[in-house]
Amino acid sequence: YDTDTASGFCWALPRAIASVFIFIAGVSLALSYSSGKVDFRHYAFRGLWIFMWGLAITFVTYAAVPYAYIRFGILHFMGLAAVLSYPLLKVRVMNLVLGFISIVLGFALKAVSAPYPYLIWLGVKPYFFHTLDYFPLFPWFGVLLVGIAAGNFFYPEHRRRIGLRELPHLEPLCFLGRHSLMIYLVHQPVLLLFVYFIGKMI
């Protein structure tokens, strides 16, 4: 079966999920900062830790699929963004402006190519670029900034602005959120094995 992953539903669905994930990550960054219990070292260490997992994914995918290995995927992005966003964690309206600019810039960079790979992390792709996972700084940093702005608005001083009753039956979703990194690391090999066996059966 020929499935087109470059357009249509198969293109839009993973990006919609990623947008929600990155937006919530921005809200979480704002929440952790407003607690007053963490400083830059926390974000630097956390960012480096996530980025190192991204590098591990790079090495694994290079060994498995060298023609489309992951050079700057969502873990690379989240690791870098966790550090770069630190000076903006207290900002509200300005983050909306910067977020919008970042998103527009990201779409503009889609039309730009370069003969070298050094600007991949910004959103400038080299010629004939193929990868399994790609989340450059632009436009995705803009989505994160919008999430930070939302977090600062809805949770000022680490308190919920809008009163909502607790929903204990949603605790499984909270568990998934607290362990999202491990879930991401596990889901890729599981999906690859699933697709492999489905391909064998068809």
Label each residue range with its predicted role:
Residues 1-202:
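Alpha-helical transmembrane segments and their immediate juxtamembrane cytosolic regions
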